[in-house]
Amino acid sequence: MRHVCGLDVHKDSVFVCILNEKGVVFQEKFGVLTPELERMVGVIMEHGVTEVGMESTSVYWMPVWRVIDPYVEQKLVNPYFIRQLPGKKSDVKDAEWIATCILKGLVRGSYVPEERIQRLRQYDRRIFDLNDDIVHKLTRLDAALQRCNIRLSNYVSTTDCKSYGDVVDAIARGETSPDALLRCVHGRIVNRHGADVIRSALTGVVTPVDVDVIRQLREEIELARRHRDECQRRMDGLCSEWFPEQYANLQ
């Protein structure tokens, strides 16, 4: 006889309901710490469950999925579709309703990639977040410079360019002389706008507090860049290990 399991996953608990064609076989509430999840897997295996269903609730489903994945086929269900199905009553527990839907074949699972792809996606999302963080911090850094009336960003193509970074590094070391800062700017920029204009743009009113803030923001940006580059290297390494032919074709 076919046995299925519905999981109602919360931040601090997982409610389990195991069903077959005759009705409820087992119900219990488990904790979310790994030993509890492993005990839950043992119960699921003891009852001969062949399919487990759970809702994609925030990130709480992910560790539950990882623990169960080596043992039983799973189905990740969109909560919207579960709630749209007719027949659910207010007094029916969520786990039992999920199990019922799985047993009757009323829902299909969302796409959950294999573990290798999940790892690559984690790195990819991290790189995306770090790039966003870098852009945000560059904006804050330029705002800190504008507060000091350092207007170099008006004359460079991007605040991520080398000249801008060199000027910021000099200020972070405590250098505020316009002539000294001018030497950090690429000659092409100076020639395009004129040395007097760039020198004026670098003549600011900089306090020791400004220097500290600029230095800290610069360090945060560099740290984010190092983390981004590390993630990219790890991602490249996994791609070359797992998909050598495809990876070679992209080089």
How does the language model describe each region?
Residues 1-251:
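A detector of single, family-specific signature residues
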